[in-house]
């Protein structure tokens, strides 16, 4: 019963690749779980979903681990969730 199509930006794909290369299977499973959840529940469930404020207004985040967040936006008109980042804390370098 998927409602949304999940699309990863190039940055999110690179971040996901870095997580895979780290060898941390728990993080890999968590990211995979988040991507599946986003198809149905982009605003609730695991990872403490949070609407972001200020310059990131319109984006949401989910906690991957203490250091990393999955950042995404939801477009209800075209039923799409765009994941823009999966590494770092709100675009910190």
PLM features: what roles do these ranges have?
Residues 1-5, 13-29, 62-93:
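Enriched for short, Lys/Arg-rich terminal
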Residues 36-62:
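A short, surface-exposed loop/turn module that caps and links secondary-structure elements
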Residues 9:
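Residue-level signal for threonine
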Residues 28-36:
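PIN-domain endoribonuclease scaffold, especially VapC-family toxins
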Residues 5-6, 45:
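Residues that recognize and position ribonucleotide moieties
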């Amino acid at each position: 019963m998927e409602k949304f199509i999940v699309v990863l930006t190039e940055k999110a794909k690179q971040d996901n690749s870095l997580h895979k290369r780290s060898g941390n299977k728990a993080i890999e499973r968590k990211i995979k779980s988040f991507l599946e959840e986003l198809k149905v529940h982009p605003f609730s469930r695991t990872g403490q979903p949070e609407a972001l404020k200020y310059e990131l207004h319109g984006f949401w985040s989910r906690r991957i681990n203490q250091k990393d967040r999955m950042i995404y936006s939801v477009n209800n008109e075209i039923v799409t969730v765009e994941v823009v980042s999966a590494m770092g804390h709100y675009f910190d370098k």
